[in-house]
C-alpha cells in the first residue's frame, strides 16, 4: 500500500505541473454523478486508444476523487447484497475497475509500482462485487479451487469467462435495441395521438431496464478484470525477474558483451587495414561487358563465361558502399532484403538467353530453306505428279473393264438349270 500511495502522490504532483490542474481543482466541488460522467467519458476514450497521457492522468485523478466520495458517503456495505443497492448507485461499483484500467495505462519509468497499484484497484473491485454477490458461482468455484496451474485449467477458465463475457455483451445489445424500439414507438405515438393514462406504464420499465443494463455492465467488467489481473501478475513477475537478474549480474554481463564486441570490431578493422594495400581485386568481367563483346563479335555465346547473377544488396553494406569481405557481412546483408521476390536472372542473362534462342531459330530456318531447295525435294514433287497420272490411268482401265463385263454376266453358270 505504501507503493500505491507513492504512485498516487507522484501522479498528483505531475498533474499539478500541467495547466489543466487548475481546472481540475475548480471541478472539485462537482457532485458525484458529474464527476463519474466525466471520468467514464475519459475511460471510454482511453479504451479506444484516443487519449494521451495528460488525459489519462486527468481521468485517474477524477476517478480517485469519485472513489473518495463513494467511501465517504458509504454507498456500499459488506452486509448488503446486490438487491439492496439502488439502481442509481450501481454504476459507482465500476469506479475501482475504471481506476485500475486507467492506472495501468499510465506511462512511468518504473512500471512495477504502476502494476501493483492497478492490481490493488482491480482486487478491490472484485472483492466488493463478491461481497454483494455479483460474481457468478462458476467463477467463485474456479477461484476457490486450488488446482494446478496447467494449460488445460487455464484454457477452461478462459472459455468459461469468454462465455460469460459474450452473454453480458448480448444482454447489453438487447437492452439497447429494446430502448431504441420503445423510443421510436413513443415518438410515433406522440406524433399521431396524445398519450393516454393507460399508456404511461411504458415509462415504468425504464428503471428495470437501467438496472439490468448496469448489472450486465458490471458482469462484463468482472470478466475483463479477471483477465487483466492475470496479465498484470505475469508482467509483474517478468519485470521482477529481469530486475533481480540485472541487480545480480546484469552490469557484469553487459560489460562483458561490450568488451567482446569492441575486441571483435578492433580486430576486424585491423585486419581490413592490413589487407587493403595488397588485396585490391581486379575489375570483374560483368555480364553486360560479355554481352557487348558477343554483339560486337569479340566473343561467342558458347565461350566459357560464368554469368553469375549478384542479387541487390540492401542495408548497411550498400549504404557504406563497401564490398562484402566476410561471411558475417554477407549474412547481415541478407537480412535487409525487400518484401517482394527478387529476380532470378539479370537483364544481361536474359538477353544472352534470347540470343541463343534466336540463333537456334535462325539455324532451323536456314536448314528448312536448304531442304526446300534440295534435289530430293524437287524429285518428290515430280513423283507426285506421276502418281496422279497413274491413278487416273488406273481409273480409266477400271471403267473400261466394267463396260466389257456388265453386272451379273458370269453368274449363269452357277444356276442348277443352266
Swiss-Prot record:
Cellular component, GO, one term: cytosol
Gene3D superfamilies with a match to the protein in the record: TAP42-like family (1.25.40.540)
InterPro entries, sorted: TAP42/TAP46-like_sf, TAP46-like
GO molecular function: protein phosphatase 2A binding
Bias (Basic and acidic residues): 376-385, 393-406
Region (Disordered), start-end ranges: 367-418
GO biological process, one term: regulation of signal transduction
Highest taxon listed in the record's lineage: Eukaryota
PANTHER family with a match to the protein in the record: IMMUNOGLOBULIN-BINDING PROTEIN 1
Function recorded in the entry: Involved in the regulation of the TOR signaling pathway. Seems to act as a regulator of PP2A catalytic activity.
Family that this chain belongs to: Belongs to the IGBP1/TAP42 family.
Entry protein name: PP2A regulatory subunit TAP46
Gene name linked to the record: TAP46
Amino acid at each position: 500500500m505504501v507503493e500505491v500511495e507513492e504512485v498516487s502522490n507522484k501522479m498528483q504532483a505531475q498533474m499539478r505541473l500541467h495547466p489543466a490542474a487548475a481546472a481540475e481543482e475548480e471541478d472539485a466541488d462537482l457532485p458525484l454523478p458529474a464527476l463519474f460522467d466525466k471520468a467514464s467519458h475519459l475511460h471510454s476514450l482511453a479504451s479506444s486508444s484516443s487519449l494521451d497521457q495528460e488525459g489519462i492522468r486527468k481521468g485517474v485523478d477524477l476517478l480517485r476523487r469519485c472513489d473518495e466520495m463513494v467511501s465517504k458517503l458509504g454507498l456500499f456495505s459488506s452486509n448488503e447484497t446486490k438487491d439492496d443497492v439502488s439502481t442509481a448507485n450501481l454504476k459507482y461499483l465500476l469506479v475501482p475497475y475504471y481506476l485500475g484500467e486507467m492506472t495501468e495505462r499510465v506511462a512511468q519509468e518504473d512500471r512495477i509500482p504502476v502494476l501493483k497499484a492497478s492490481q490493488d484497484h482491480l482486487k478491490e473491485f472484485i472483492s466488493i462485487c463478491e461481497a454483494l454477490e455479483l460474481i457468478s458461482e462458476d467463477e467463485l468455484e474456479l477461484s476457490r479451487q486450488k488446482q494446478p496451474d496447467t494449460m488445460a485449467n487455464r484454457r477452461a477458465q478462459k472459455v468459461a469467462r469468454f462465455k460469460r463475457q459474450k452473454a453480458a455483451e448480448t444482454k447489453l445489445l438487447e437492452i439497447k435495441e429494446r430502448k431504441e424500439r420503445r423510443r421510436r414507438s413513443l415518438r410515433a405515438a406522440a406524433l399521431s395521438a396524445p398519450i393516454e393514462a393507460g399508456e404511461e406504464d411504458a415509462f415504468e420499465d425504464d428503471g428495470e431496464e437501467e438496472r439490468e443494463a448496469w448489472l450486465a455492465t458490471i458482469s462484463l467488467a468482472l470478466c475483463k478484470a479477471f483477465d487483466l489481473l492475470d496479465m498484470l501478475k505475469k508482467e509483474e513477475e517478468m519485470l521482477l525477474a529481469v530486475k533481480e537478474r540485472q541487480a545480480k549480474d546484469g552490469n557484469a554481463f553487459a560489460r562483458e558483451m561490450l568488451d567482446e564486441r569492441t575486441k571483435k570490431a578492433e580486430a576486424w578493422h585491423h585486419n581490413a587495414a592490413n589487407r587493403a594495400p595488397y588485396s585490391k581485386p581486379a575489375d570483374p568481367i560483368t555480364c553486360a561487358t560479355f554481352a557487348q563483346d558477343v554483339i560486337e563479335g569479340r566473343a561467342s555465346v558458347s565461350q566459357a563465361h560464368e554469368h553469375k547473377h549478384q542479387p541487390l544488396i540492401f542495408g548497411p553494406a550498400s549504404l557504406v558502399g563497401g564490398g562484402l569481405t566476410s561471411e558475417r557481412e554477407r549474412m547481415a546483408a541478407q537480412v535487409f532484403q525487400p518484401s517482394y521476390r527478387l529476380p532470378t536472372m539479370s537483364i544481361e542473362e536474359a538477353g544472352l538467353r534470347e540470343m541463343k534462342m534466336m540463333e537456334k531459330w535462325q539455324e532451323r530456318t536456314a536448314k528448312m530453306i536448304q531442304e526446300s531447295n534440295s534435289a530430293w525435294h524437287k524429285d518428290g514433287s515430280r513423283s507426285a505428279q506421276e502418281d496422279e497420272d497413274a491413278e487416273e490411268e488406273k481409273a480409266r482401265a477400271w471403267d473400261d473393264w466394267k463396260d466389257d463385263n456388265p453386272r451379273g454376266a458370269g453368274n449363269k453358270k452357277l444356276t442348277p438349270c443352266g
